């Protein structure tokens, strides 16, 4: 059976929310957690592919996790891999930025340089704050 094609919103390659994600990345590179947190809603949730299924972190827990990361790694670069898209869905009025990052870090314990690809989805509320972030990367790469 054939279905009629239909749309579900608009995809942007230039948008204010994409700019916010870029500013967020710059804040992480500068290790400015206060500035980074300003892009999030107070009740934001964080998901990570390396966490057990169904688990998430609060904004405060994510901040502590980032501090732990800074204690153990130096971020050398975080470059856009391709370009981010902003998806303004009609269904449920979801607003999502999809971004791929080519990340290069130095592990402080032994000086090893590690490269990995990180895919992030950032869901925004109507006020333009991030309410959900999902991270997809190979966490084992950081420990090898």
Model region roles, listed by residue range:
Residues 1-34, 38:
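Short, low-complexity N-terminal intrinsically disordered segments enriched in polar/charged residues
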């Amino acid at each position: 059976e054939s279905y009629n094609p239909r749309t579900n919103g608009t995809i942007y390659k230039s948008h204010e929310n994409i700019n916010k994600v870029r500013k967020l990345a710059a804040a992480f590179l500068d290790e400015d957690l206060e500035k980074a947190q300003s892009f999030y809603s107070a009740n934001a949730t964080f998901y990570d592919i390396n966490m057990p299924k169904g688990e998430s972190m609060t904004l405060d827990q994510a901040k502590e996790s980032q501090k732990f990361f800074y204690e153990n790694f130096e971020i050398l670069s975080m470059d856009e891999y391709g370009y981010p898209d902003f998806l303004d869905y009609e269904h449920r009025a979801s607003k999502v930025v999809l971004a791929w990052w080519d990340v290069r870090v130095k592990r402080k314990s032994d000086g090893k340089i590690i490269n990995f690809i990180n895919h992030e989805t950032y869901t925004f509320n109507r006020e333009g704050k991030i309410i959900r972030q999902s991270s997809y990367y190979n966490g084992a790469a950081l420990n090898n």
